[in-house]
Design a protein with these regions (language model features):
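Structural register within alpha-helical repeat arrays
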Residues: 20, 27, 60-61, 107
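TPR-adjacent "capping" and linker segments in tetratricopeptide-repeat scaffold/adaptor proteins
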Residues: 7-23
């Protein structure tokens, strides 16, 4: 994951949280590969609730929820991704804009599909 902008210090607690969140993402991916989607969802949802500042848990959850037809959940996660990633200090402004644009496009496509 990209570092913070120059001059912004990360606290020890923030570092520990980031490491725990990253470990949960890896556990979530392993759970998905093993076919345990409920465990994967729980791990990703915790990171979403904590505002993990990278796209992996949001993208994985949206994919799972869309496959299940749980479009309300997919929309909720997309909106949270846009909120968290737009405010993240862990990426450059250009990276933030690009990532947020991807999630906004996914949200628009989901909403169009729902109206469809």
């Amino acid at each position: 994951m990209p570092g913070r902008p120059r001059g912004v210090q990360e606290t020890l607690e923030e570092r520990w949280l980031l490491e725990a969140q990253t470990a949960r993402n890896l556990e979530g991916l392993a759970a998905e590969q093993a076919g345990d989607l409920e465990a994967a969802i729980a791990l990703y949802e915790r990171n979403v609730a904590e505002g993990f500042a990278a796209d992996l848990p949001y993208g994985r959850l949206v994919a799972i929820y869309e496959r299940r037809g749980a479009l309300d959940d997919a929309e909720r996660v997309l909106r949270r991704a846009i909120q968290v990633l737009a405010a993240s200090s862990r990426r450059s402004a250009a990276e933030r804009r690009a990532t947020v644009r991807v999630f906004k496009n996914r949200l628009a496509a989901l909403q169009k599909r729902r109206r469809g």
